[in-house]
Amino acid sequence: MISVKKHFGDTSGKYLYLSGWMIAAMRSEFGPLPDQSMHEKTSVPALIEELYTFLRQADARELGDLFTKLDNANDNDRSRIQKEIENFKTHVVPIIADIDAGFGNAEATYLLAKRMIEAGACCIQIENQVSDEKQCGHQDGKVTVPHADFLAKINAIRYAFLELGVEEGIIVARTDSLGAGLTKQLAVSNEPGDLGDQYLSLIHI
């Protein structure tokens, strides 16, 4: 973000995306791993905290330089430097965090999402694979959870945002159904009009 700000003048419209693939490859205590949710679940919130600490330090360093210049400025430069301080553009940008498949059931998803939000994530991405069977995005043989289970995890993330007072938190819900078999792709319908029936009505055979 320091380089981005130097090049563009500010970081408006920019963000950081912490993908599960990147975390698994670079932040696991077990060393580089494939994108199969084998890294420690706390790796993402820990990295969010680390990044925000670094970005705030970048702000502090740049502002510190400006205040030093202000202290040593003559009358001609003081107004210009004061305006730079007042119009300072932060290095801090939104962070999108990949929670993979939630690392467990809906409650586990809620607890981890809450930790990510507390660390500073404003957006959480979740996918509908079974956590214990997670495959890399380019691989076949994926196993997806039932639709109701996925919705429970999405709601768990929503509840985490609301509990922490973040009313405009963003959830990116991604499906891997195309790479999964029909056993998990089709929703179970118990009666007309239920959630499963609504999903099945969208399928054209």
Q: Where in this protein do the model-derived segments appear?
A:
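Active-site beta-loop-alpha junctions enriched in small/polar residues
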Residues: 1, 21-23, 100-104, 129-131, ...
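N-terminal glycine-rich anion-binding loops that anchor highly charged ligand groups
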Residues: 2-28
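Generic structural signal for hydrophobic
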Residues: 4-8, 51, 116, 157
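Short, well-ordered coil/turn segments that N-cap beta-strands
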Residues: 12-14, 90-93, 121-122, 165-169
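Hydrophobic faces of well-ordered beta-strands that scaffold small-molecule active sites
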Residues: 14-18, 95-99, 124-126, 171-175
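Active-site beta->alpha loop and helix N-cap motifs at the rims of alpha/beta catalytic domains
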Residues: 34-151, 182-187
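Phosphate/pyrophosphate-binding betaalpha-module
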Residues: 123, 146-169, 186-195, 199
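Conserved small/polar residues in nucleotide/adenosyl-binding loops
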Residues: 203-205
